[in-house]
Amino acid sequence: MNLEIKHAILVLWIFLQVQGIKDTSTKTHSSGTKNIDKAPRIETTESTSAVHKASTMKRLFAVAKLRNKRSALFPAVNICPRESLRQILESLQEYYRLRVCQEIVWEAYRIFLDRVPDTEEYQDWVSLCQKETFCLFDIGKNFSNSQEHLDLLQQRIFQRSFSGRKDDMSPIEILGVPTTAPVLPIDVSSMSLRPFPLPPDDTDLKEVTIKDIQTPIAIRRAELESKPEPTHVTEISSEEKVEFSISLPNHRFKAELTNSRSPYYQELVGQSQLQLQKIFKKLPGFGEIRVLGFRPKKEEDGSSSTEIQLMAIFKRDHAESKGPESDLLSLDSNKIERERIHHGAIEDKQPEAYLTAADLKKLIIRLLDGDQPLVGGTVPFSDEVTEPLFRPVTQSELPKPLTDVTEDVTLSPELPFSEPRLESVDIYGPYLPDSSWSRPVTASTSGVGNLPSFTPSIFALDDQSSPPLMATGPTAFIPTLTLPISDYSTVRQWPLEVSHWPESSSDRELSTTSSHDTIRDLDEMDVSDTPALSEIAELSGYDSAPDRFLEMTTPIPTLQYVTXSSETIAAKGHELVVFFSLRVANMPFSYDLFNKSSLEYQALEQRFTDLLVPYLRSNLTGFKQLEILSFRNGSVIVNSKVRFAKAVPYNLTQAVRGVLEDLRSTAAQELNLEIESYSLDIEPADQADPCKFLDCGKFAQCIKNELTEEAECRCRQGHESHGTLEYQELNLCPPGKTCEASQGQATPCRPPDHSTNQARQPSVKKLQRQQNKVVKKRNSELSATDFEELDDQDWEGN
């Protein structure tokens, strides 16, 4: 009972408290209303600006309530509530690196390359930046040193007009018209017509020194001074001509240089054009370079030198052709002339290019040293000149007329096309005595017949009196042919690998320097002149038994080259030899190219010789000979061999590859020859197998001499040659002939195109007498189909 009373009292008390609070709030509201009514009214003259300001703030706060708030601490980063503080910080740092790297890479492409990057390359650079592979500023250095950036700068220097500098110059500086002769001397100390060295990056600015230039030079495209002042706009030309001169301080001026027909003049012109074309072709629009003449020059020390006057012609498209037809920019490498500006109707329309001393210096340095290194590596040529820069041409080196042919012969056919066999190569030693043949001598020209003009496939830079490069140990020589070629030719001398055979039209006796007064003609030779097979079996790489061969793989070459980045040295007593092959994709192959005596082979051989020899000679120090070994099918594959000195001041393989890559681009532009880059196969002799570049056919096998490292073709079992005495004991098939299948007995080697090119085959009297009528009839009736079927049967039987 008491508990219920207490509970009722508590409820009543709570009710009274709540009721009292309501009464108090009502009184307060009433008093506030009364006070407001008693207060004075706000005057209408008060400024309305405060009211407008308050309303604006209210609107801003209202709009802010509708906007999504951005986190001030974690922008664009999703924070998981379960992450720790350390994980949150790592996420922020990773996002920071991503955004910074994206901006850096994007700006690098925009500033240095002026283009939008591809997606893959952009992601690659961002990934490298995030992994801290490159420092932030190293990325900019990498882009600024890239070849694409340097090419872009080079194009802008030649194509962009620096018109913004015109207002900063005085009229005298812009016009560049002094009171005396308008010449500013510039000393280019290292400019010469030897192969230009590619110096290291830290020394390239020392190559060219520019003096006496204090103000910017405005080089203007003006008209030729020989033409009168123009009064109207002439036709727009597609060419722009640049005249300049080069000083040769160590080359004295000679009287022969005043006669443009003299051999010395022609040689110097050719060397100058070859050197400068390689450098100027890097400039956009370069067309050709012409030698205008030579003149003497006196140096500061009183010595005499030669100055070459040249003209470079650049081709322009119609968008860039804004100057008159006779636009000529006179740029002298030792003298930069400020040309007179013709005042006329076209003065305001001529584009101008203002170059400061720094711009001009960089331009000349880049022109001399070259921006792009050779593909496959830079060729580090030596700065020292061990020989005279230009050697006067002697009478013996001048091209000879066609009547100076020393022997009336033709070339034998080439071996048939077949893939080279590398798996089985035999090695043999010297196998012919010294008395077999004598060295070739010059015979009378009275019996010379009409021969097609062609050039042999070996060219050398040495004097004709020097010993033959291929003569090592006891060798045999065949009378050869001396033909009119350029100044780098010598008499062609072959050891065993002979491609020239005497004609059978008449018997000839040749005078020799040996103990014999005369040499017996081929028809008077006997088998006793040749050593028996048993006498040389110990030195040869195959068994003397006639029923089988000693097959062996190619051993490790004993010839080893010392190759470094700056030099290549051959073994003692040897020369540096490089084999290379290249493929011309847009040239159809003809089976006449298997026959070295065919006119098509000779013409193509001459074409590639004229193309390759000048490049190799002018760019590779120590170059001696180029020998075109053969042409193979596959469009046209050219197999060649190059001989050098015993030591050269550069990496031989990289240098040859670089020159051939450079030749490939030149041939594609000027000669329309598509030489495929991936087809270039370059191997030094100490690493290469010479049989790889020699085709012997299905019935022959390649063998290699241990001493001379030369490759030969030898008939396989059942296809031995019995028709030529000099090869019958050794089972060797002469170059240009193939081993022929036979039934029951071996038959002589025959040219690969016996049925179609019989008129051009070399014939020897001895072969004609030894071949009886039965053999001739069998050979003539042997068709191509029977030949192939019998070929396969014999091959399977072996």
Curated annotation (Swiss-Prot):
UniProt short sequence motif Heparin- and hyaluronan-binding, positions renumbered to this chain: 624-632
Entry superkingdom: Eukaryota
An annotated GO cellular component: photoreceptor inner segment
Signal peptide coordinates: 1-20
GO annotation terms (biological process): extracellular matrix organization; visual perception
Residues covered by the SEA domain: 238-360, 574-687
Entry's localization field: Cell projection, Cilium, Photoreceptor outer segment; Secreted, Extracellular space, Extracellular matrix, Interphotoreceptor matrix; Photoreceptor inner segment
Gene Ontology MF annotations: chondroitin sulfate binding; heparin binding; hyaluronic acid binding
Keyword Signal in record: yes
Biased composition regions of type Acidic residues, renumbered to the chain: 786-798
Residue positions the entry lists as glycosylated: 142, 442, 445, 595, 619, 633, 651
Region (Disordered): 741-798
Major subcellular site: other
Alphabetized UniProt keyword annotations: Cell projection, Extracellular matrix, Glycoprotein, Heparin-binding, Hyaluronic acid, Receptor, Repeat, Secreted, Sialic acid, Signal
Function: Chondroitin sulfate-, heparin- and hyaluronan-binding protein. May serve to form a basic macromolecular scaffold comprising the insoluble interphotoreceptor matrix.
PANTHER family (alphabetical): INTERPHOTORECEPTOR MATRIX PROTEOGLYCAN, INTERPHOTORECEPTOR MATRIX PROTEOGLYCAN 1
Protein name: Interphotoreceptor matrix proteoglycan 1
Protein species of origin: Rattus norvegicus (Rat)
